[in-house]
Regions:
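N-terminal "arm"/small-domain region of PLP-dependent enzymes with the aminotransferase-like
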Residues: 1-55, 148
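PLP-dependent aminotransferase class I/II
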Residues: 37, 204-281, 285-288
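Phosphate-binding glycine-rich loop
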Residues: 62-102
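PLP-dependent aminotransferase-like
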Residues: 95-154
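Short beta->alpha connector loops at strand-helix junctions that form conserved
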Residues: 107, 126-131, 185, 209, ...
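Active-site phosphate-binding strand-loop segment of PLP-dependent enzymes
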Residues: 129-189
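Conserved PLP-binding catalytic core of the aspartate aminotransferase-like
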Residues: 270, 280-304, 332-350, 367
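Long, intrinsically disordered low-complexity tandem-repeat segments
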Residues: 305-331
Length: 368
């Protein structure tokens, strides 16, 4: 095969793809279990009939941006829309990352932050979370001071661990970061607070959101960012012409007419999350608290349930230490990983697909 090699810095990378398996219960990608209302489907079908398919869509997606702006009480000039929040993140990294620039994440966290950063040619530096997966201001300050990142990602609630970041920590990060701070809020509606109040034209912070989780629209691949006007202008520079098709635009506009349905759905998911957390804490599992629409847990070989994953000495079965450093725990991590894989397979054999989180550092044997 006369194959031409890809870039040297991409040779060790593989694609980021979640399994798609036909099973009765699919939980591995945190999609909404709730279908959109029938009225939404009806209204969208009518709106699709008005699309002029022989013409390019509105390049600026003005009506959609205005509708999102009204939802968050900002100006349309503070809104950037794209094909899922992943394209939002890619646009940020094309604008502010790249060769000679550094991107900071705090592991374990959403893997596409570092994945897209590397594709964009950025150098990625990883800070550490505490043993309970919270993030300390000292660690954030160390990473910002030592590495001077052009882009700093905070995921709140954090995927895959489930906790929202402390609002005071987010504010202090924004105040001290040398570059832009992106708060990934794909699951924000399930949590008690948001970083949106920090966004203004004098700040270097932006908040990314998605229609995939709370709006029951994962099939549409629609996301957006709320940021200062100068950042939206920069993102428009790197966006491809007519990048958001007409169908996505009308789907988003139509969905935003059903805010109350979305909010009821979120409330139902939160209630079910709390019920499930309560039940899981009676089982032989290590279970972490969640402020998202998923729960991180590790099957416990000792047969005793734990909450939060941290014992009084700060140790965990994956080898995490109370100082926030992590390893896969050597033999203990290998044993935990094997137990986790067996439970994952057992669930799959019974029609339930969950996420095996062992590929994240420090999450050997964990499932989500």
């Amino acid at each position: 095969m006369n194959r031409y090699p890809k870039r040297d810095d991409l040779r060790a990378m593989s694609g980021y793809h979640s399994p798609q398996v036909s099973v009765p219960v699919r939980l591995n990608t945190n999609e909404s279990p709730i279908e959109p209302p029938a009225e939404f489907v009806r209204d969208l079908a009518a709106a699709v009939g008005d699309i002029r398919w022989n013409r390019y869509p509105d390049r600026a997606a003005r009506e959609l941006r205005s509708a999102i702006a009204a939802l968050h009480q900002v100006r349309p000039e503070n809104v950037f829309v794209a094909n899922g929040s992943n394209e939002v993140l890619q646009s940020v990294l094309l604008a502010y990352g790249g060769a000679g620039r550094t991107v900071a994440t705090f592991e374990p966290t959403y893997q596409l932050h570092s994945h897209i950063a590397r594709i964009a040619g950025s150098t990625v530096v990883n800070g550490n979370r505490n043993a309970d997966f919270t993030l300390s201001e000292d660690e954030v300050r160390r990473v910002l001071t030592d590495h001077q990142p052009s882009v700093t990602f905070l995921c709140s609630p954090n995927n895959p661990t489930g906790l929202a970041e402390d609002p005071a920590l987010i504010a202090s990060t924004v105040a001290t970061a040398p570059g832009v701070v992106v708060v990934d809020e794909a699951y924000a509606q399930f949590s008690p607070h948001s970083a949106l109040p920090l966004v203004n034209d004098d700040s270097r912070v932006a908040v990314s959101r998605t229609f995939s989780k709370t709006w029951s629209m994962a099939a549409a691949r629609l996301g957006y960012l709320i940021g200062p006007t100068w950042m939206i202008e920069d993102l428009d520079v790197v966006a491809l012409p007519y990048h958001l098709d007409a169908l996505k635009q009308v789907a988003g506009i139509t969905a935003l007419r059903y805010v109350s349905h979305m909010e009821r759905g979120v409330a139902g998911v939160v209630a079910e999350r709390e019920r499930l957390l309560s039940e899981m804490r009676t089982m032989p599992l290590t279970v972490w608290p969640s402020q998202a629409n998923f729960i991180l847990f590790r099957p416990d070989s000792t047969g005793g349930a734990q909450s939060g994953g941290a014992r009084s000495d700060g140790a965990r079965s994956d080898g995490a230490r109370s100082d926030g450093a992590r390893s896969d725990g050597g033999a203990a991590g290998g044993a935990a990983g094997e137990i986790g894989r067996r439970v994952w397979q057992h669930l799959l054999d019974n029609g339930v697909l969950v996420r095996d989180c062992s590929s994240w550092e420090g999450l050997a044997g964990c499932l989500r």
